[in-house]
Amino acid sequence: MLAIVFIPFHVIHKFMTVPVLDMGSKLSIYPIILGIGCYFYQAFKKRTTWIPKKYVYFVISLFVVQFFSTVNGLLVFPYWSSINIDQFEKLVKLVSLIPNSDSILNQDSNIIGIIWLSIKIIIKLMFNFLTTYGCSLWIISLYIRCKENVFKYFYKGIIGGALLCTIYSIVEYVHLFGGIWASIILTKINPLFYDVASSHNWWPPLFYGNRVRSLFAEPAYLSTYLSIAIPVSIYYAMVKKTSNWLWKLLPVILIIMMLTTNSKTAIGILIAECALASLLLLIQFRKLTSKTYFKKVIKNGIWILCAVIIGLGCNSVLRDRYSIDYDVTNIQDNHIITLKIENTGWMTWNDVENYQLTAAWYDKQWNSFGRVNVTIPQTMRKGDTAVLTIDLPKLSDYEKYSNVVIELQKFGPYETGELAGQGANKLTLNIEDGHLIPLKDLQNEVVDMSAIASTSNGSNQQRFGMMRVDYNIGKEYPILGVGGNDLKQAYVISNIPDSLKHNAEVKLWIQSQNENGIFKSSFPVISEYPHQFAVYGTLGLIGFLIPSGYIICQLLGLYKKWLHIDQELFWKVFSLVVGYFGLMVSFIAGTTMQLYLYWIMLGTMISLLLSIKNEIL
């Protein structure tokens, strides 16, 4: 149960991470390693595995595919000349202990680096399989031995983690609605959960603007977690006998949290889960006339509808958390700008949080020069105005820099950063006929969670772009892929289209890899499905999808045992199936390695199939 409760703590401090493992940064790794270790001890002691052989054979087969893919990837890797000892900190420390290490580093640096990388990748593959698919097999073995206790602890673990997220988010909402005391609390406790800005010097951030993320590093991860937590909490509210109103309140809060992540992943999950839930309820509705069934559907439907309405309202309020109006009153010598600003939003700009106007010259590629920050010297409530003067560097000509952008930012002791993504408009000026003139159009960069298919809104540009990069890499090696994520990093930059290289976040990833090397700074995995195609080819992608296809086929084959007979069994299957479907949808914009959720759910779903066959849940 602890492994499930710990799922939200997916980016622990570096000194706590388990080396070699991709899942080593998750707090859940500790109880899972302990559980798998106990399993091996008991299996060796009793000379049995408890796991149906077909599942063991499948995992072994998938491992063989990925192993050969990795070996093939090492053999065809075209960038060996760029590999040396300096890219591996632990190897440098190890070689430094050897006498005459300087001569070794100078003469055999490339060969030693190649051998080290090859061994590291193969060992990493073995341990990753043990803690991912091995985790799923371990859960199946627990079901074989403990039966219904597996589901009881699964439900309690999800509910326990959801309660932790809810308690945290109460403080988070106070912060988002302007409570300084909540900002102070979060400033103190967030660094206790993870190393702030440990990756690329900004991720995970201390705060995430106007978006709810709870205990997770970013809102999309919370959405992925809630894909399971919401259906499970609804089921729990239906079966819990004591304090029933309290358990009905939990899914309402979780749905509100899902909608206020302002995440496209969230809206995609909700649409997918609602569609499947409606289909299952419609099929059940046609077969049953039980008043109890109708009562449950109507009561819970009302709760869910209320939650959606409240969540959409909160999303609308938080999405436009800041609003500002600019009135340029004077421009001197094309660089001294006097303007009146008005706070037109509901959020108070407290002077202790150090609100500023930031301005800079920009070229045609929107690279900045001569940035100037001017502090707003007073607390500003809705309707308050202030007059500020911005003195930009004077330019001798405007061939390169011909645009000026002014925007609101916060540079306080708790939260920092530009506020354009939270509703505050930007003011753009440009040079026309030798004079700096303000434009009427104001740029607004608010992220819209409903813009799922947009190629430019929010993070969609780099998301769709990097998915295309993975697809292009997979096309070059369509059968076995390039042999794992570590090797894939060397192929990424050469496959990034020029149009994507101008994206700010992609530019940061490219710069980091160019400065630190291929294996010290990696591109994040954006989407599981094209990633599987890129790293393990068509065989690996099919192997990844087989468990989900097997679950679907088995559920369809067993539908007479769970869809029309016992209502309690139906609701249990309903919650897990809807949640699992939403989780698989989330991998369009996420990966299985972000949270420990998929591997636990995979074992739970196989256990569900076994329990349906035995009509015991």
Roles of regions detected by a PLM:
Residues L2-T17, P31-Y133:
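N-terminal hydrophobic segments of proteins, predominantly signal-anchor/transmembrane helices
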Residues I4, P8, P31-C38, L270-L281, ...:
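Transmembrane alpha-helices of multi-pass inner-membrane enzymes
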Residues G35-I36, M126-I139, F151-K287, V297-I302, ...:
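Alpha-helical transmembrane segments of multi-pass inner-membrane proteins
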Residues Y79-I112, G178-R211, H435-N460, D486-Y529:
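Interfacial juxtamembrane loops and adjacent helix segments
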Residues F369-S396:
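Intrinsically disordered, low-complexity Pro/Gly/Ser/Thr-rich segments with frequent PxxP/GP/PP motifs
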Residues S396-I431:
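Terminal connector regions
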